[in-house]
Amino acid sequence: MIAVETQFGCLGIEEEDGAITSLVWDGHTTGEKTPLLIEAGLQIRAYAEGRLQKFDLPLRVVGSEFQKQVCDLMSAIPFGYTRTYGDIAQDLGCPAQAVGQACGANPIPVIIPCHRVLAASGLGGFSGQGGVEGKVALLRHEGAASLLI
């Protein structure tokens, strides 16, 4: 794991077999700093500094096929834009609540931007540091805060 200090918290990034598998808050650097972890750290820092809008990293989502589909659709949401749980549910032909649960179980937040998925009636939840306030901070960083009004 490599840890990167940002205004959103200390983000810990893990890799396994050449792919990023996890991002956690309150991370600590442990083990070998592989070239992929170093690159992921550079990209997280560039994102936090406003110099990167789209991550270019190999990712591996460990989870059900449904979880992977939701993560793929979240990854397709551009920087500064949002979608609703209902939008994604409609794409997949499933209930919005199932999409919300999959968003909450996202193993690679920020890189897979679950913060860009909102409830139809407002923000919805956020499993990252700071809860909904953390989600708002990420959306403000991306210039999407006007969508919250």
Where are the regions that the model predicts?
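Basic nucleic-acid-binding alpha-helical/helix-turn surface characteristic of O6-alkylguanine DNA
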Residues: 1-94, 141-149
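Structural signal for hydrophobic
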Residues: 74, 114-115, 138
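Residue-level detection of the helix-turn-helix DNA-binding "recognition helix"
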Residues: 104
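Short Lys/Arg-enriched helix C-cap and helix-to-coil transition segments
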Residues: 110-119
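…primarily DNA-binding HTH/wHTH and HhH modules…
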Residues: 121-149
